[in-house]
């Protein structure tokens, strides 16, 4: 369960990076230079700093692709977990459970799996509290 939480936190972190605001491109920097007619040394330093932002765009592209790969693998894992949970919980065959899960959207599958693990962890915590208070 700890690994699942850590993986979920990593997925959220990559999502934040991928969704962040894109940096200014070199084309936009050229427009700024033309508009402001930069002659001052400080402005030239500022433009050099902004030119380095193109590296950030490449990094953001890498994290965006990595995020898509991680999300795809997480979706596959959740699909398998949802099938296993349905087989165990509802007592149906694996094929029937697979058909039910295939009919669900990715969002519904995620919610189903997270809801199951949330109930499971809260019931374990509740049992620990009840047992510790009874003695």
Swiss-Prot record:
Lineage of the organism: Eukaryota, Metazoa, Ecdysozoa, Arthropoda, Chelicerata
Known role: Insecticidal, cytolytic and antimicrobial peptide. Forms voltage-dependent, ion-permeable channels in membranes. At high concentration causes cell membrane lysis.
Keywords attached to this entry: Antibiotic, Antimicrobial, Cytolysis, Hemolysis, Secreted, Signal, Toxin
GO molecular function ontology, one term from the record: toxin activity
Summary of the tissues where the protein is detected: Expressed by the venom gland.
Annotated gene: cit 1-16
Keyword hit for Secreted: yes
Subcellular location: Secreted
GO BP, one annotated term: killing of cells of another organism
Entry similarity comment: Belongs to the cationic peptide 06 (cytoinsectotoxin) family.
Originating species: Lachesana tarabaevi (Spider)
Protein's UniProt name: M-zodatoxin-Lt8q
Propeptide, residue positions: 21-60
Superkingdom to which the source organism belongs: Eukaryota
Extent of the signal sequence: 1-20
InterPro entries: Latarcin_precursor (IPR018802)
Entry GO CC: extracellular region
